Each structure stands twice: as structure tokens, then as C-alpha cells.
Design a protein with these regions (language model features):
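Bacterial N-terminal signal peptides that target proteins for export
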Residues: 1-12
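Bacterial N-terminal signal peptides
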Residues: 10-20
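Conserved functional micro-motifs across diverse proteins
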Residues: 22-217
Length: 217
């Protein structure tokens, strides 16, 4: 049998191990390095404007391991959006809208940071002494984990306001696919609201989700 003296030591060791596991599980998010959008299978090239938009799904291993939060388990589809501007003038994407349209005609708009966070943090609105992560109240015992989740979502989301000449910008779109049948097979992602330097809106981007690039969530 273990002596009473050894029990406190074992407890301390176990606590240290659990602490290390927790720190590892919620490591700082490191975004993937984007290539030129023209190199991805799922893309739409606007030759006249010299702008290409592409997507890459991050809903299955090994790619989804860059996240600490298993978004697919919460019914959320993470999609890396890559936009390359090979022209000589900047383009504006601050009012860009993204929509996922499935073969079943479901139309899903990209989620805001708070929408993603509420799902993965499983917000409990009954807390009597809430603290806040971003604009959202949380009970104290959830706050540290939730802060890591919120920081990851904020760091991951596509947040560029413009794509400068001869530059590539990237970031994640998040879609709520909970309960949606075949959300990726045969689906398309549409981008609207992209404007040139003169304020003129470009023709919408229609990016097919290619089957080889689309692991089902």
C-alpha cells in the first residue's frame, strides 16, 4: 500500500501533469502560411482584375490539429480563405460577405467571432457573478479556458480590410453546419462585396468545394 506520506507527493505530481496537459491543449494559435491562391484546387480566378480567391478546409486531421478547439465536434466548419491580388492596385475586402451554399440549397453565412465562441464555450447565462470574455459574460471557473478559445477564434478569423498589390491575405471563415446533410460535398462558397481601388464591386467569386479537398465533418 502507498504510505500516507507519499500521497501528497503523488497529488502534486498529478496536478503538475494535468497543468501541462491543459497548457498544451490551449497553445497559442499559429496560422498556416498561405501560398498564392492560384495554387489551391478550390479557387476562382478573376483574370481581368488579377485577383484569385481560394479555400482550404480544416475540418479533419491532420490539418484541424492547428486548432486547440475541435470545431467540427461543435458542428462548425473551419474554412481557410486565401485571396491573392496580382494587380497593381489594392482591393477592399472590409465589407466582403461569404456564403456557403450546399447541394441541398442550404445557404449558410459566415459566423461572427461571438457566434463561434458562444457555441464552443457553451455559454451558461445563469451565472450570478459573471466575468467577461470579449462582450460575453462567463462564470469565473470558465474564464481562463474561454479566454484561450476566444483568442484563438479572433486570431484565426479572416480580418483583412484590404489586399495590397502583389500580396496574399488569408484567414478562416467559420460556418454553422450542425444538422446540415453533406455540407461540403458539391458545395460552393460565394464571396461578394470585394471592391477595387475605385470603389467598384468586383463580380462575385464562386469557389467550388472540390471533393478531394472536402473531408466530411
Amino acid at each position: 500500500m502507498l504510505s500516507c506520506r507519499r500521497l501528497p507527493i503523488l497529488a502534486v505530481c498529478l496536478a503538475s501533469v494535468l497543468s501541462c496537459v491543459t497548457l498544451w491543449a490551449y497553445k497559442d494559435f499559429v496560422p498556416p502560411h498561405p501560398e498564392n491562391a492560384s495554387t489551391y484546387p478550390s479557387k476562382d480566378v478573376h483574370s481581368n482584375e488579377k485577383v484569385t480567391a481560394a479555400i482550404d478546409l480544416y475540418n479533419a486531421a491532420p490539418k484541424d490539429q492547428i486548432f486547440s478547439t475541435p470545431y467540427s465536434q461543435y458542428g462548425i466548419l473551419p474554412v481557410l480563405l486565401i485571396i491573392t491580388n496580382d494587380g497593381d492596385q489594392p482591393i477592399s475586402v472590409n465589407n466582403m460577405r461569404a456564403e456557403l451554399v450546399t447541394t441541398g440549397k442550404s445557404k449558410l453565412e459566415g459566423l461572427e467571432t461571438d457566434d463561434v465562441f458562444r457555441r464552443v464555450a457553451r455559454i451558461n447565462g445563469s451565472s450570478t457573478e459573471p466575468t467577461h470574455v470579449g462582450p460575453i459574460p462567463l462564470s469565473g471557473n470558465k474564464n481562463k479556458k474561454a479566454q484561450k478559445q476566444y483568442d484563438e477564434i479572433t486570431a484565426a478569423r479572416f480580418n483583412a480590410e484590404a489586399v495590397e498589390p502583389h500580396t496574399t491575405r488569408s484567414g478562416f471563415l467559420f460556418f454553422d453546419v450542425q444538422g446540415v446533410k453533406q455540407p461540403t460535398a458539391g458545395a460552393h462558397i460565394y464571396l461578394t462585396g470585394v471592391r477595387d481601388a475605385g470603389g467598384n464591386e468586383l463580380i462575385y467569386f464562386d469557389i467550388p468545394v472540390i471533393p478531394s479537398n472536402a473531408a466530411q465533418p
